[in-house]
Amino acid sequence: VEKYRLTDAARTVDYQENGVTHKFTLRQIEALRDFSDIKAGTLGGWIEEESNLSHDGDCWIYDHNSAVFAGAVISGNARVTQPCTISHGASLTGECWADRADISHGAAIYDRAMIQMSQVRGECRIFGDARVMHQSQVIAAVGLTEDRDQRLQIYDNATVNGSRIVHQAQIYGRALVNHAFIEHRAAVYEDAILEGNDENNVWVCDCAQIYGQARIVAGNEIDQCPTIRYSSQVFGHALIEGDCVLKHHVHVFDDAVITGGPVQLDDRIKICGQARVTGNVFIENQVTVTDDAVIEAFNGDPLHLRGARIISGNEYITRTPVIGAI
């Protein structure tokens, strides 16, 4: 039984892509019967054709300023509230909710996922109880890496706030991503927390992974943006805060703490145990800092450690050793 009809009211929407303006003619929907919280006669949003909105389930386009067109499909019990634009093959189904969102170009939103005040574009999947909110941008792109088939995914109970998630990134578990830039095939999962702010993002890229109960926290001063790159991993209960850059094959885990001023770690570095690194520190080439060891630079003076070695026990290093000098 049909639950709505296309009214005679029509409007044209312009959609710009690659510098070309495309025009779509839409019709407003009107409910023909009562269902869910909709009463017969209720006017809804605008669609290009009936294939855009299923007659089955309780799915509905609530706002009079919402538009669904160009092969997009709303089905199941999906809800579209506040002004939304759903287009170009996007699909919303299950119990998902789009609220003041722009969703397009093959994005698939399902289960109980929520997209609020955000943009989702490209062939990605957002599902489970995932939430994408507060002016986030999710821009999927495939074919840019060796894994040409991997799709960007945000799922489980992951929450993304005010962040930019692009390419083939994966965010899942109970991960909390605030004011971050996640790109390429980077992954944030389990109970990891990324805490950027209005001044500085947390940047995770390449094939880096943040997981366990790790926390990456941006500072409030200029250039206090933590950057996790290449195949680096941060996990366990590790904390990284401020101007820190992790490059090739860096592992920070257990209860290690790194506080940037700035800190740069590169080439098979392990910071673990209860170790602490702080200040203007550069560590490279197969150095392990573990146990209760502390590497601390004072007054902005640079401290440089390099070459295969293990710093352990209660070692406390505050200046560049002669053997480690540049």
Task: Report each predicted region and the residues it spans.
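Glycine-rich active-site/cofactor-binding loop and its immediate structural neighborhood
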Residues: 70
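Terminal amphipathic alpha-helical/low-complexity segments used for targeting or macromolecular assembly
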Residues: 1-58, 64, 77, 83, ...
